[in-house]
């Protein structure tokens, strides 16, 4: 760059505004007095652009000669929803992150250094946890593992992960290898029956329900529940539901844990699903349930799993009676104490949803749920059930 370079500089100033600086004749071309400068720019919708799956081609299609075809068809397929959009950093957030970023001194040594640099590289980070390879089983020395939960998405795309790691390598010291891994998301689902005094309010059950959902979401937004090393406190959640409206007398709320996994389609695989929380072994009904999926042995109908006699069984539903028909009485083991599922030699050809993921649900031994290390705790309000009853 020299004094003739046609460049300009963009700085952020007060009140979240931007300032354009032209060259001074040494760094960039200097503008003449009274020169007229026209500026055009694109703005984004920030976080409002997240979660988009359907896209339409709105451009102009031309061949190398600049000629457009008289008729053409475009088909845009999105494998994942858009993510990563973020609002401008607030002054409060800058005051919080700036000292941490300065403390790294542009090198990644401690866990705090890695966190500050990753948040700088990828601002749309909801939560992050870093641990050394020596804590892995088996140990992987010389590696640093980074589990990152993005905002408005469960996982990062492979392209985004590669971009973050490539940028992070500029700050890593010695021969340490950074590894960015997906979080293991542990979902907590609630089934709540809310009883309220109809003589104290003219609100309908649906209005009471909406108030409860709003109260629960507000609590989750301000508590340390949804995060790595998060803890779900049952008594606090019951209190939040009761306090959602003065007319509420009580609530009966049950807790279910859920994990989603993505099978390797058309391959015989061993699957292990760890919940890190013990299961309620003394239930009369099965502790384990799943969404439907398909396997090579039974490709024409959905199959499900549940636990019986400490074993995982594979079954289908009778199309007429709806009764469970056992197809295999032993496809894996369930460890109620460790909170683990192990399924052997499954060849899955189709999952439950559009992205082929499969959901498994279990009843926990304790209603207080914890998440450790790379496990991210997420209270899934959208898939929870809240029903209000007038007394």
Regions of interest found by a model, annotated:
Residues 357-391:
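Feature of secretome-associated and extracellular-like proteins
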Residues 30-44, 348-370:
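Extended Gly/Ser/Thr-rich low-complexity repeat segments
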Residues 69, 74-76, 207-298, 304-305:
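An aromatic-glycine-centered, glycine-rich loop/turn in mixed alpha/beta architecture
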Residues 223, 299-353:
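Extended, beta-strand-rich, solvent-exposed assembly scaffolds of outer structural proteins
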């Amino acid at each position: 760059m020299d004094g003739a370079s046609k460049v300009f500089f963009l700085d952020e100033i007060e009140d979240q505004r931007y300032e354009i600086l032209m060259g001074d004749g040494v760094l960039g071309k200097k503008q003449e007095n009274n020169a007229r400068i026209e500026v055009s720019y694109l703005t984004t919708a920030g976080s409002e652009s997240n979660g988009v799956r359907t896209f339409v081609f709105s451009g102009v299609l031309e061949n190398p000669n600049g000629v457009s075809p008289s008729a053409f068809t475009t088909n845009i397929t999105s494998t994942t929803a858009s993510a990563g959009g973020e609002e401008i950093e607030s002054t409060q957030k800058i005051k919080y992150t700036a000292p941490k970023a300065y403390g790294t001194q542009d090198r990644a040594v401690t866990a705090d250094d890695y966190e500050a640099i990753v948040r700088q590289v990828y601002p749309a980070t909801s939560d992050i946890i870093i641990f050394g390879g020596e804590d892995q089983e088996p140990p992987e020395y010389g590696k640093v593992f980074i589990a990152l939960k993005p905002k408005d998405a469960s996982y990062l795309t492979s392209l985004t992960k590669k971009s973050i790691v490539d940028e992070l390598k500029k700050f890593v010291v010695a021969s340490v290898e950074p590894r960015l891994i997906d979080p293991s998301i542990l979902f907590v689902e609630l089934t709540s029956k809310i009883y309220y005094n109809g003589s104290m309010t003219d609100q309908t059950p649906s209005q009471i329900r909406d108030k409860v959902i709003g109260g629960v979401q507000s609590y989750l937004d301000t508590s340390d529940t949804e995060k790595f090393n998060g803890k779900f406190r049952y008594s606090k959640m019951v209190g939040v539901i009761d306090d959602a409206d003065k007319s509420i007398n009580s609530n009966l709320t049950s807790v279910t844990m859920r994990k989603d996994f993505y099978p390797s389609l058309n391959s015989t695989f061993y699957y292990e699903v760890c919940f890190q929380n013990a299961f309620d072994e003394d239930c009369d009904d099965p502790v384990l349930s799943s969404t439907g999926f398909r396997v090579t042995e039974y490709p024409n109908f959905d199959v499900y799993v549940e636990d019986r006699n400490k074993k995982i069984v594979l079954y289908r539903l009778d199309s007429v009676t709806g009764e469970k028909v056992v197809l295999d009485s032993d496809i894996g083991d369930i460890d109620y104490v460790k909170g683990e599922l192990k399924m052997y030699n499954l060849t899955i050809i189709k999952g439950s949803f559009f992205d082929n993921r499969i959901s498994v649900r279990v009843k926990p031994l304790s209603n207080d749920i914890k998440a450790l290390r790379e496990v991210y705790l997420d209270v899934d309000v959208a898939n929870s059930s809240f029903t209000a009853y007038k007394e």
